[in-house]
């Protein structure tokens, strides 16, 4: 018998109240979103980071075709430089970044966005250099 025999997969959509009501034991999400939402709603959580188990997160990756890198390297370089400048600004000006997000989506919580910026700062510097996995 394996641990997998004890697991029941439940389709929950985005109804996180099923987690709050302990109908489901585990909730998958982004470190800068659902754990903060849960804490702010009064539900303490234990966050398990995929990076602690050898897997990174695909969110925030910049992906392009090898063909684009070969045929238009300046476009690729300029896009990456601009993206990193945006990250640097947002992480150095968390309040502005949170306000900007709310301007684009008024249903967002300022407190949540501000806390999310702190989590994102840790995640974007995971390997010691923002924007790089290895040197």
Region spans (language model):
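Short helices/loops that flank or line small-molecule/ion binding pockets
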Residues: 1-4, 8-32, 40-41
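Solvent-exposed loop/turn segments at secondary-structure junctions
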Residues: 15-17, 33-36, 51-55, 68-69
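Short beta-strand->loop
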Residues: 8, 44-56, 67
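Ligand-binding "clamshell"
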Residues: 23-24, 37-50, 112
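Active-site-proximal beta-strand/loop segments in catalytic clefts of secreted hydrolases
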Residues: 30, 50-52, 101
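A bilobed periplasmic-binding-protein/Venus flytrap-type ligand-binding module shared by bacterial periplasmic
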Residues: 58-75
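Secondary-structure end/capping motifs
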Residues: 70-135
């Amino acid at each position: 018998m394996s641990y997998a025999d004890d697991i029941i997969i439940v389709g929950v959509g985005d109804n996180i109240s099923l987690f709050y009501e302990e109908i489901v034991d585990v909730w998958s999400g982004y470190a800068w979103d659902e754990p903060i939402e849960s804490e702010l709603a009064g539900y303490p959580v234990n966050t398990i980071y995929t990076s602690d188990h050898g897997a990174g997160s695909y969110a925030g990756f910049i992906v392009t075709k090898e063909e684009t890198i070969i045929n238009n390297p300046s476009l690729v370089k300029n896009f990456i430089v601009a993206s990193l400048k945006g990250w640097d600004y947002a992480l150095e000006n968390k309040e502005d970044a949170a306000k900007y997000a709310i301007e684009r989506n008024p249903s967002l919580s300022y407190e949540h966005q501000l806390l999310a910026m702190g989590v994102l700062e840790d995640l974007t510097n995971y390997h010691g250099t923002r924007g790089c996995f290895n040197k």
